[in-house]
């Protein structure tokens, strides 16, 4: 069994517990009282290369990264540094995240939010709405094509922007067939956890220019952002290097400054 399969098994078990505790109708009732999600596509299409900063305590590849006792404070630092969107891990077992983290961040910032989890059910999309997300991660490798298409359509119907994650040529094709507008290329293979920063440069040419291309994993600083930019990235998602550093606001600001270089401003 791959690492991804193990994670999905845990996600399904935890999901079943939440579904038993909170009926779907209750989530729908709560969502109906909330404002419509923010326009994530517009934020990502702003001039230059945008920065998505992540609230991430742990990962399967590295284990514990940072305690992050106050995710709201970290999110405020990210927003002050200029992040165009904040990604919040909500998977419990391998990433030590929670929906409570998402709610805390939503209460702290006006920046668009991404719920980063292993979504396998439309119930999780309703959760994302209720807890304040504007976008949701959908991982192609974790879903059948029918499920992917269904979740993309349902997310959009709820006002959520699907960030559809790929790692191979076949997955790019599947993402496009599912109607994805925002496609994230993960340099990390979720089945082996190995990182290959060349993955983005290899797959980006397969993604049409009218789509938004996000480089995920492997961004250690401005030099990596610029490398991804040269390969066609519209945005980068950065987690580990921000949470293990001592100055997240400054680190985000450095990335944002690199992404705003005049040579990158007319890319959209």
UniProtKB/Swiss-Prot annotation:
PROSITE patterns: IGPS. Pathway: Amino-acid biosynthesis; L-tryptophan biosynthesis; L-tryptophan from chorismate: step 4/5. It is an enzyme of class 4 (lyase). CDD domains: IGPS. GO terms for biological process: L-tryptophan biosynthetic process. SUPFAM superfamilies: Ribulose-phoshate binding barrel (SSF51366). Keywords: Amino-acid biosynthesis, Aromatic amino acid biosynthesis, Decarboxylase, Lyase, Tryptophan biosynthesis. InterPro entries: Aldolase_TIM, Indole-3-glycerol_P_synth, Indole-3-glycerol_P_synth_dom, Indole-3-GlycerolPSynthase_CS, RibuloseP-bd_barrel. One of its GO terms (molecular function) is indole-3-glycerol-phosphate synthase activity. The keyword Lyase applies. It catalyses: 1-(2-carboxyphenylamino)-1-deoxy-D-ribulose 5-phosphate + H(+) = (1S,2R)-1-C-(indol-3-yl)glycerol 3-phosphate + CO2 + H2O. The keyword Amino-acid biosynthesis applies. Its EC number is 4.1.1.48. It holds the Pfam family IGPS. PANTHER family: INDOLE-3-GLYCEROL-PHOSPHATE SYNTHASE, TRYPTOPHAN BIOSYNTHESIS PROTEIN. Belongs to the TrpC family. This is Indole-3-glycerol phosphate synthase. The lineage of its organism: Bacteria, Bacillati, Actinomycetota, Actinomycetes, Streptosporangiales. The gene is trpC.
